[in-house]
Amino acid sequence: MKKDYYETLGVTRSSNKDDIKKAYRKLAVQYHPDKNPGNKEAEEHFKEVNEAYEVLSNDDKRRRYDQFGHAGVGSSAASGGGGAYAGGADFSDIFSAFNDMFTGGGARRGGSPFGGFEDAFGGGGGGGARRRASSGIHGTDLKIRLKLTLEEIAKGVEKTLKVKRQVPCEVCNGTGSKTGATETCQTCHGSGEVRQVSKTMFGQFVNIAACPTCGGEGRTIKERCTACYGEGIKLGETTVKINVPAGVENGNYMTMRGQGNAGPRGGAAGDLIVVFEEIHHETFTRNGHDVIYNLAVSYPDMVLGTKVEVPTLDGAVKLTIPAGTQPETMLRIQGHGIGHLKGGGRGDQYVKVNVFVPKEVSHQDKELLKDLRKSSNLCPNAHHDSESKSFFEKARDIFS
């Protein structure tokens, strides 16, 4: 089973493009084959990182992946060799990765041999923290499980759920401040970031991180709201509508942007991740887009043929059992299976026919069965012997 692309890059579902790009650069440097010659494990990690970045750096692919998982992007993501480079990653990512190889990772170093490329493509450090200062702290993602019947999965369904999550505080309107007043953070002086400078034999390195005092916001609260203790969020309950497409499977999930926990002090809300769980069906067995129904038929009906009523996911339908039907025969009812996730009709229902053998019979039925047993036409060995004889053996039997 493929690893989640967000886990591969070590980012969350609410991460923006800059966070994803930064994580990709760091991992690309860490697992690059030039830094790990002959290391097959590092090579595999490098391919996984490239594949994940190709999807998550593309808005359309990321949207489909968030909604349907790996099934949503299909073969569009690289399967090992090409990765982000083959998928069209911009040159700034490539040059930045090489820059990191020369400078020791994610930190910036003065006098980088690739500084010109970095400036040309907007790869300068520090922007991420400043952007966080203007947008606040993101809320966390929320994951729930949604149980579905096979009937609901077959055609898709709309579900309305009540979800407990962090919501903006009504008293302070999510600001976390009792009066609404804020002041410039004394630690970062409003930049939302702090810098740590270290000197090595290779030069001076500057590591930039979000300010721990204000969380990257650049401002702090003067007087905290007593209802939410300055967080700007409280536990609440909201109602969400979920449009479940036909054809989902166990473990498939849908990401609902901005429906997760609200961010502290006005920060953007995280995502709601709905994981689908198929309820075991007592009548049908699922096989991909098809369903299987086991039907027991009496011996006379198997021999003579009959019409029976069988259940489907859409209601009962009439089914013809042809004369001479053999046990384990699969009869198809077209279009009564599971809808395809990406559209294009539904699968089929297969009816597996078997002989019904009663455990107890009446005296009269026993006598009838004894008479039937005497018939050579009902003896499987007689049929087998007859079919296995050669032409000359059959001719000899006729004239002897």
Curated annotation (Swiss-Prot):
Q: What do the Gene Ontology cellular component annotations say?
A: cytoplasm
* Listed InterPro entries: DnaJ (IPR012724), DnaJ_C (IPR002939), DnaJ_domain (IPR001623), DnaJ_domain_CS (IPR018253), HSP40/DnaJ_pept-bd (IPR008971), HSP_DnaJ_Cys-rich_dom (IPR001305), HSP_DnaJ_Cys-rich_dom_sf (IPR036410), J_dom_sf (IPR036869)
Predominantly, its location class is: cytoplasm
Instruction: From the UniProt record, list the CXXCXGXG motif repeat ranges.
Output: 169-176, 185-192, 211-218, 225-232
- Cofactor binding mode and count: Binds 2 Zn(2+) ions per monomer.
Record-annotated disulphide pairs = none
ZnF segments: CR-type: 156-237
Q: Where does Zn(2+) 2 bind?
A: 185, 188, 211, 214
What the entry says about domains is: The J domain is necessary and sufficient to stimulate DnaK ATPase activity. Zinc center 1 plays an important role in the autonomous, DnaK-independent chaperone activity of DnaJ. Zinc center 2 is essential for interaction with DnaK and for DnaJ activity.
What's the stated role of this polypeptide? Participates actively in the response to hyperosmotic and heat shock by preventing the aggregation of stress-denatured proteins and by disaggregating proteins, also in an autonomous, DnaK-independent fashion. Unfolded proteins bind initially to DnaJ; upon interaction with the DnaJ-bound protein, DnaK hydrolyzes its bound ATP, resulting in the formation of a stable complex. GrpE releases ADP from DnaK; ATP binding to DnaK triggers the release of the substrate protein, thus completing the reaction cycle.
What is the name listed in the Swiss-Prot or TrEMBL entry for this protein? Chaperone protein DnaJ
What species does this protein belong to? Chlorobium chlorochromatii (strain CaD3)
UniProt lineage = Bacteria, Pseudomonadati, Chlorobiota, Chlorobiia, Chlorobiales
Gene it is expressed from: dnaJ
